[in-house]
Amino acid sequence: MRLQLILTITLLLTSFMGYRDAAVIQGKTERSAMKMRKLLQILHKNSCGCNDDDSDGDDCCFGTCLDNACWPVKKRSSAI
């Protein structure tokens, strides 16, 4: 009975630690993704010349200006 109690407690502790580690990894992944999106916005902004003054997309090297960053626009296929 005592051994069963020890094994149960050990199992519960290890499963809790696994969930906690998974949550930590997920949180780090989400923060990394946010940092990457911000970095991509900065790179697009700097490389394409998108600025606060002109948000109509004329100054982008491709695509359109959105949130002060240049983004590619998908071309629509023309129907024949």
UniProtKB/Swiss-Prot annotation:
In its keyword annotation, does this UniProt entry include Transmembrane helix? no
Q: What is its main location?
A: secreted
Keyword Glycosyltransferase on entry: no
Which tissues does it occur in? Expressed by the venom duct.
Prosegment location in residue numbers: 23-36, 77-80
GO molecular function terms noted in the UniProt entry: toxin activity
Q: Quote a single Gene Ontology cellular component term.
A: extracellular region
Keywords associated with the record = Cleavage on pair of basic residues, Disulfide bond, Knottin, Neurotoxin, Secreted, Signal, Toxin
Q: Where in the cell is it found?
A: Secreted
Taken from the UniProt record, the cysteine pairs bridged by disulfide bonds within this chain are: C48-C61, C50-C65, C60-C70
Q: Which residues form the signal peptide?
A: 1-22
| Entry domain remark | The presence of a 'disulfide through disulfide knot' structurally defines this protein as a knottin.
What this protein is called in its record is Turripeptide VI/VII-01
Q: Which species does the entry assign this protein to?
A: Gemmula speciosa (Splendid gem-turris)
